[in-house]
């Protein structure tokens, strides 16, 4: 194949791929006048869903960071029997359909679930509450963060860890003053990607928490609900969600460029595993 033919073929393939990815997003904004977009800030459905999304996503994300960071550090620093199986288990939610995740959460924490009687005895009801939303979001986003955090901690030079221990630093000091700062770039990228995934969660949430406005209805659920009632409102909320996602991605790119001179957060996150 000649060089010109190859260049033409790759250009056509790239053009088709780019058009396929861009066209649906452009179509949303072509259907939504700016006035309708701004009007959504006065829409009670949108405001309630935004509050629920931000509240539950932030709580879930903080929990993922608090529990996921030490877990990732342990897995990255230690070599033990079953380590590979444990990592595979952590990654398993990545390949599960969201509906399966929701049913699994119901089977574990629902009223008739594995822990249902114990929770009921304590007067705790999780299913179809904001707590259920938080658990659903944490379940689907945690593999994104933990897997990226493991790679980030693995990228830290073991000699620096050993040197800190030789100088008398205890495990807490080594973790907080050496490992965390050196892995901060990758941890930040993994955190942002996990947060974005959590904000977009739909399937597990609607099955485990339902879609009650002002209580468990997040932005993705509000879009789905409005789709059956007012397509224009669903389009406007979708456009706002695209803008939120774009803002997160741009922030990632700026952060990655500032830290590593790369505009790709995915390349940046991958570089931490080397």
Residue map of PLM features:
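Hydrophobic alpha-helical transmembrane segments of multipass integral membrane proteins
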Residues: 51, 55-67, 71, 97, ...
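Interhelical loop and adjacent transmembrane-helix boundary motif
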Residues: 2-6, 37, 44, 205-251, ...
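Transmembrane alpha-helices
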Residues: 11-18, 92, 139-141, 145-157, ...
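C-terminal transmembrane helix and the adjacent membrane-cytosol boundary/short C-terminal tail
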Residues: 3-11, 16, 24-27, 150-165, ...
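Cytoplasmic-entry segments and transmembrane alpha-helices of multi-pass inner-membrane transporters
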Residues: 7, 11, 74-105, 161, ...
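Transmembrane-helix boundary motif in ABC transporter permease subunits
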Residues: 38-40, 59-90, 103, 107, ...
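Periplasmic/extracellular loop-to-transmembrane helix junction in inner-membrane transport proteins
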Residues: 2-8, 26-62, 74-78, 225-231
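Membrane-interfacial helix termini and adjacent extracytoplasmic/periplasmic loops
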Residues: 35-38, 47, 102-138, 209-211
């Amino acid at each position: 194949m000649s060089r010109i033919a190859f260049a033409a073929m790759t250009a056509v393939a790239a053009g088709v791929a780019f058009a396929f990815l861009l066209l649906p997003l452009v179509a949303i904004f072509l259907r939504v006048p700016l006035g309708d977009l701004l009007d959504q800030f006065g829409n009670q459905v949108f405001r309630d869903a935004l509050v629920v999304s931000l509240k539950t996503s932030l709580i879930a994300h903080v929990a993922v960071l608090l529990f996921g960071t030490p877990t990732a550090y342990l897995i990255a620093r230690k070599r033990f029997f079953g380590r590979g199986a444990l990592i595979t288990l952590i990654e398993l939610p990545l390949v599960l359909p969201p509906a399966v995740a929701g049913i699994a959460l119901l089977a574990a924490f629902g009223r008739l679930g594995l822990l249902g009687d114990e929770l009921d005895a304590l007067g705790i009801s999780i299913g179809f509450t904001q707590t259920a939303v938080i658990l659903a979001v944490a379940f689907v986003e945690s593999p994104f963060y933990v897997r990226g955090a493991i790679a980030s901690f693995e990228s830290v030079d073991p000699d620096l860890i050993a040197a800190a221990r030789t100088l008398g630093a205890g495990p807490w000091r080594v973790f907080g003053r050496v490992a965390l700062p050196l892995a901060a770039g990758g941890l930040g990228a993994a955190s942002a990607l996990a947060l974005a995934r959590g904000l977009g969660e739909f399937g597990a949430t609607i099955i485990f928490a339902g879609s009650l406005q002002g209580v468990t209805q997040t932005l993705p659920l509000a879009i789905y609900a409005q789709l059956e009632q007012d397509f224009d409102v669903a389009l406007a909320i979708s456009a706002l969600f695209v803008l939120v996602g774009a803002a997160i991605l741009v922030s990632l790119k700026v952060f990655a460029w500032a830290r590593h001179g790369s505009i790709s957060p995915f390349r940046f996150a991958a570089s931490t595993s080397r």
